[in-house]
């Protein structure tokens, strides 16, 4: 049974590394009954990894626009999902994510980190504020 209230999205480049991870993630999401949009993208000439990752926000916005009643979760294509915990899937938050390295607030060491959020998994709710 597919959950109708959420969708997982990601994109990947067509090289062997990322396309094989896309295939594995797609299979996991299908097994879990989680709707998904996994998009193959082409890198522009001269585009590097940082340029490619900057396309993430526009892509997520397009998934939100196409799915206004669904929570939208971004998962890096080379991540694995064994299950989606209820406290995440059923969250009513506008924005949900994990802090860097998935640590507790006492372990993060803000002075040692350049970013608070772990960019590999985060989600948006369906409220106007979230979108």
Per-region residue spans from a language model:
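N-terminal anchoring/stem segment of glycosyltransferases
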Residues: 1-70, 126-128
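GT-A fold catalytic core of metal-dependent nucleotide-sugar glycosyltransferases
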Residues: 54-114, 121-127
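Flexible, glycine-/basic-rich loop-and-beta segments that form/coincide
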Residues: 131
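Short, flexible turn/loop "capping" segments at secondary-structure junctions
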Residues: 2, 113-116
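Residue-level detector of short, conserved catalytic/binding motifs and their immediate flanks
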Residues: 6, 119-120
């Amino acid at each position: 049974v597919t959950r109708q209230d959420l969708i997982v999205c990601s994109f990947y480049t067509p090289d062997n590394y990322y396309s094989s991870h896309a295939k594995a993630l797609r299979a996991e999401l299908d097994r879990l009954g989680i709707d998904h949009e996994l998009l193959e993208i082409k890198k522009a000439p001269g585009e590097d990894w940082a340029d490619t990752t900057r396309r993430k926000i526009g892509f997520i916005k397009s998934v939100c626009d196409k799915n206004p009643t669904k929570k939208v979760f971004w998962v890096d294509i080379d991540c694995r999902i064994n299950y989606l915990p209820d406290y995440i899937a059923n969250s009513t938050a506008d924005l949900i994510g994990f802090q860097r390295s998935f640590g507790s607030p006492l372990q993060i060491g803000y002075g040692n980190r350049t970013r608070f959020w772990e960019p590999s998994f985060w989600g948006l709710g369906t409220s106007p504020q979230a979108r």
